[in-house]
Amino acid sequence: VTAPGTLVERIDAAWTALGPQEQRVAGFLRARPDESALYNAAELARRTGVSKATVSRTFQRLGFAGAQEARDLLRAQRGAGLPVVVDDPDDAVAAQASRDAANVQRLAAETDRAALDAAAHAVAVARQVVVLGFRSGFPVAMLLRQALVQARPDVRLVPEHGQTLGEELVGLGADDVVVVVGLRRRPASFDDVLRALDTAPSRTLLLADPSLGPTPADWRFDAAIESASPFDSYAAPLALVSALAGRVLAGLDGAGAARVAAVRAAYADLGELGA
């Protein structure tokens, strides 16, 4: 019988077959799946008050060869975007800053400057720009739209709360650009959206991370989101958004600067922004 995928699923499936001591170990693992990636069998035995043999037997009943295989599964879950701790740095802020810096440096090394300029030019001269983001990609898309709308008009963010997407994609023309932000843990419909855009006359600019396989798009740029914490980091995607928006503004020359000035004046007239 094939064991269920995650550690918690395996525990739930095997719970009634476990003895009292084994349930003590399994209960600890179920309550602290993040920590489970940190401990070997001896440490788990110490923390649960059972023997090392009991810990080993528990893992076997859960379908693992041993504690290391369970830790490997947790690391794989983290690679799929699930929040699982894989290390325990003494200085979490320093560890995260180091990881973020590495992700941004990777972005700088791997981004095709000519392609970025071409994509930025297309965004600058498009009739309208539609910025599309799902789940964790939505706040990144929102920040991109916020930057672009200060540089040029007719920039829409979709889907808004309560919206469906179909009506937003109808009527796109060859002089429109759709910017899609698709980061790890994308919705199941994500590939369908890209295929629909591939058949549309508009052009598609995809901002993704390396976990996404080959996809149809006129331009694609990847930003790593690996993290020192249990959750993905968006330092590199946000750096990519900033670089893209900056190139768009630069490509608009005087028109972009004039719009920025007009937006700034509107903020002042409305008293919307503080210092």
Regions found by a protein language model. Name each.
Residues 251-275:
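Internal, active-site/partner-interface "lid" segment
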